[in-house]
Regions:
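Beta-rich interaction/scaffold domains
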Residues: 1-38
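Surface-exposed repetitive/solenoidal architectures
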Residues: 32-176
Length: 176
């Protein structure tokens, strides 16, 4: 388009093409639970200690929670999670703890998990899954409270939350 000579409809059409091209480059987030492929290595989680071992390098990794677990106030995880975490309907209880992860990264999926308890040991708003969600949260529930509690996370940043519900009390945060 020539500067100053394009009609509004031409500008709108060019803007739509550009927007469509940008959207095509973005990775689509799943909106239904992710099935773990045959033949891949799955890490089974049965304790809080095993959760603490999930640090970096989670991209393409699969984690399955085999029973309910409790994370206490001394639990800290500084990981951006980019794997698949399947709670299989189990509950992660937070007892004055930080969230399960620092944040859910763009390729991270957390599914089929219930979160309950209290957020503590934090200095800013956070949720059961940390500060932000860029990936997907599917078939999950959260029921938390605390001075800085924010439901699943402080913010949804291009991520998807589907078939999930959030309850709780928070004097400072949003409960999504």
């Amino acid at each position: 388009l020539d500067a100053g000579t394009a009609s509004q409809s031409e500008v709108n059409a060019a803007a739509k093409k550009l927007s469509d091209a940008v959207n095509a480059l973005k990775k689509q987030k799943p909106e239904a639970p992710v099935k773990i492929p045959e033949g891949v290595t799955v890490t089974h989680i049965t304790s809080a200690d095993q959760i603490e071992n999930i640090w970096s390098g989670t991209e393409g990794q699969y984690y399955v929670l085999d029973n309910d677990i409790t994370l206490t106030g001394d639990y800290m995880n500084f990981c951006e999670f980019n794997g698949v975490f399947d709670g299989q309907g189990h509950t992660v209880t937070l007892k004055d703890s930080q969230g399960l992860f620092t944040r859910v990264g763009e390729s991270g999926v957390v599914q089929n998990t219930a979160f309950k308890g209290t957020i503590g040991n934090v200095w800013e708003n956070t949720g059961a899954l940390g500060g932000s969600i860029k990936g997907a949260v599917l078939n999950c529930s959260v029921e938390i409270s605390g001075s800085y509690a924010c439901g699943f996370a402080k913010k949804l940043s291009g991520g998807v939350i589907a078939n999930s519900i959030s309850f709780g009390e928070s004097p400072k945060g949003a409960l999504f």
